[in-house]
Amino acid sequence: MPPPIREQIAEHAREELPNESCGLLLLEDGQAVEYVRAENADASPYRFTLYLDPIRWSEIELDQAVVHSHVSAPPRPSRTDVENIGLWQGRPYLIYSIARDELAAWTIEDGSIEPLQLG
């Protein structure tokens, strides 16, 4: 994970307090190349629904990973994350913990959670 992109994720998370932040990590050949801020349509400290302008989303041609923050919990998928995985099932799923200043990556598929290495 390039340090400038990690810092953009952390900065966005801090700015959205007390709510969770969310966004997209754009990937080229499996490597992070850009962080795109999105809106948490739930405006909640406990859950998120990612909203990105549909026109902006349609312009993205790279692979995508979802990113969201946990305000006080560790950067591990919560039960809510697993139950609401939706279209992110099987894709890289990154969580930034504001309280711990930690970023971790996972895949969630059919209720199974597997860690991913951040490059």
Give short role names for the model-derived ranges:
Residues 69:
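Extracytoplasmic ligand/sensor domains, especially the bilobed periplasmic-binding protein
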Residues 1-63, 72-119:
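Conserved beta-strand-loop surface patch within small alpha/beta domains used
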